[in-house]
Each structure stands twice: as structure tokens, then as C-alpha cells.
Amino acid sequence: RICTPIPFPMCY
């Protein structure tokens, strides 16, 4: 699972 804070918080 990868989480990114930009451009908005999302995990996929």
C-alpha cells in the first residue's frame, strides 16, 4: 500500500 499526502491524502 502506498500513501501520499499530495495533492491530497490518499492511500492505494
Swiss-Prot record:
Sorted alphabetically, the Gene Ontology BP terms of this entry are: defense response
What are the UniProt keywords, alphabetically?
A: Amphibian defense peptide, Disulfide bond, Secreted
Q: Which terms in the GO cellular component ontology are assigned? A: extracellular region
Q: Which domain of life is it from?
A: Eukaryota
Compartments reported by the entry: Secreted
Task: Name the major location.
Answer: secreted
- Keyword set includes Disulfide bond: yes
Disulphide bonds annotated for this chain are: C3-C11
Tell me the leader sequence span: none
Q: What tissue expression does the UniProt record report for this protein?
A: Expressed by the skin glands.
What task does this protein carry out? Stimulates insulin release from beta cells at a concentration of 1 nM and release of glucagon-like peptide 1 (GLP-1) from enteroendocrine cells in vitro. Reduces secretion of interferon gamma from peritoneal cells in a mouse model. Has no inhibitory activity against Gram-positive bacterium B.megaterium Bm11 or Gram-negative bacterium E.coli ATCC 25922 at concentrations of up to 100 uM. Has no hemolytic activity against mouse erythrocytes.
Protein name, entry field: Tigerinin-1O
Q: Which organism is it from?
A: Hoplobatrachus occipitalis (African groove-crowned bullfrog)
Top-level taxonomy: Eukaryota, Metazoa, Chordata, Craniata, Vertebrata
